[in-house]
Amino acid sequence: MARAHWGCCPWLVLLCACAWGHTKPVDLGGQDVRNCSTNPPYLPVTVVNTTMSLTALRQQMQTQNLSAYIIPGTDAHMNEYIGQHDERRAWITGFTGSAGTAVVTMKKAAVWTDSRYWTQAERQMDCNWELHKEVGTTPIVTWLLTEIPAGGRVGFDPFLLSIDTWESYDLALQGSNRQLVSITTNLVDLVWGSERPPVPNQPIYALQEAFTGSTWQEKVSGVRSQMQKHQKVPTAVLLSALEETAWLFNLRASDIPYNPFFYSYTLLTDSSIRLFANKSRFSSETLSYLNSSCTGPMCVQIEDYSQVRDSIQAYSLGDVRIWIGTSYTMYGIYEMIPKEKLVTDTYSPVMMTKAVKNSKEQALLKASHVRDAVAVIRYLVWLEKNVPKGTVDEFSGAEIVDKFRGEEQFSSGPSFETISASGLNAALAHYSPTKELNRKLSSDEMYLLDSGGQYWDGTTDITRTVHWGTPSAFQKEAYTRVLIGNIDLSRLIFPAATSGRMVEAFARRALWDAGLNYGHGTGHGIGNFLCVHEWPVGFQSNNIAMAKGMFTSIEPGYYKDGEFGIRLEDVALVVEAKTKYPGSYLTFEVVSFVPYDRNLIDVSLLSPEHLQYLNRYYQTIREKVGPELQRRQLLEEFEWLQQHTEPLAARAPDTASWASVLVVSTLAILGWSV
């Protein structure tokens, strides 16, 4: 599970806003957070002074006759990660957390975020800002109704509110005599001015054919075929998510951190292809790739990114029907299309199609995971040698694993910010160390590594938790129950077209048996050199049904607040299951190839079926990764792999431990203190 944002996938709100929702932030000490109750207020050095920027913003609000202005923390494409160019909320507030909304009135300013970021907000915001510890539109609107007068106008950038978010604000304000006002010129941008980072300008390039599952022409033809088969026969499909355009044309760039995308829209009609982007970024080779020997309906017209609203409005004047996926379309696009000309589904045909990988895409993703396993194994071997020296901290460790991945063939950087967490930090949501704030790795503590890579042939995401010393009995039990959950879901056979939410509980059952649980989702889709969190695959209530060819992560966990955290994450391919009797059934094929920590496994808790599965998995790891290690003369890592994939044998529970439990339980029943 990568560090999550509101953007790339709406499921992340469920996966992560609830994840560890009751864990306590790191206690940074009273002098590390602001204290606005003193005179003068105490402000740590991490605070940003926002007085001048707020004054300038309010002047802009006056020119628009606004009583309030909403500043979301997203961009125009609901990206999971956003570029510096789009970090408006962070710039105006000083708060850089990946989730949260700011609202400014003529007299007050406030930020709403969830428990993951409360301490961070108190460290970064000055006393111009109130911190509200709720999320969603309802608490924001409740606050607005008390702060702005009747007749007040609430402004927003329509390209920063999704259709659903706009509808929730609009509904909440109905009957209040306050008006929601769409303003296409972003007011924060006007204040930011020349200090605002520029839009990235690196080349947009075509993937080599070896790394694509289909040509872009085949993909376009497939989408047009779906248009013709749709009940409402749309004349066009509008693509707003950056991953959609990148996938459709097999194009990549580096506009977004950790994601190989470029700012773009696509309007694919039954007779034309219009790609909205910065044309100057297309080399002659890329332009030729798009239009070499093309005929009318298969020629790509590149139009300026800024013209998308005007172009869609002009197209909408005709006898047309525009098909959109509402989950990724912003209100700024939606408001330009007459409602009678809209064809809406939750997800666009591109989002649905790319969720199911063809045989070539499957092979590419599997190959990337073999090389990724080499990088992770190299790191684990390096840790075993260096942690006892006391020279490794969370941040330097993250740098090393990123370095090892960068040395792998076809590497294009990490797929998210590495989560490198030791001891109690592993129990914190989205903990990522910094050079200034980190914890030393110790042989006496558990260590959680959640990391992934972008490769030309695939995107990876894997989590392993290890302990180099003597773990407690409870740590071993918790780890083993998490492992059992991973195995139970990975080996499950279920009917085709079953939704992920129907089987998700199998990953929790072993934890539930002991009264344990985890607060986050159990998995997410993953792309081919695209998003590390690829919607709409996964185990949430609003994910689509599982189908052969989908890839998903499987990642149960357990988090002991203030002590340790455990997560075991693998990526798995949905495949046909072999059953005794004929039928349409599916199961998972795990494609992550790094062994689990034997030091943390209590074999006595494993059933014969669990052991059989685990030993088969270890044999697969040997077969897939072993030859690659040998080919590259990584002999120390090969020996490590052999040791850590030795077959596990069944073992009876520790009778002494059970006797101790029995004695303690008996004394407790008798009412004696122990």
UniProtKB/Swiss-Prot annotation:
Keywords of the record: Aminopeptidase, Cell membrane, Glycoprotein, GPI-anchor, Hydrolase, Lipoprotein, Membrane, Metal-binding, Metalloprotease, Protease, Signal, Zinc
Complexes and interactors: Homotrimer.
Catalytic activity: Release of any N-terminal amino acid, including proline, that is linked to proline, even from a dipeptide or tripeptide
Glycosylation sites recorded in the entry for this protein: 35, 49, 65, 278, 291
UniProt signal peptide: 1-21
Key word Lipoprotein present: yes
UniProt-annotated location(s): Cell membrane
This protein's name: Xaa-Pro aminopeptidase 2
Membrane topology classification: Lipid-anchor; GPI-anchor
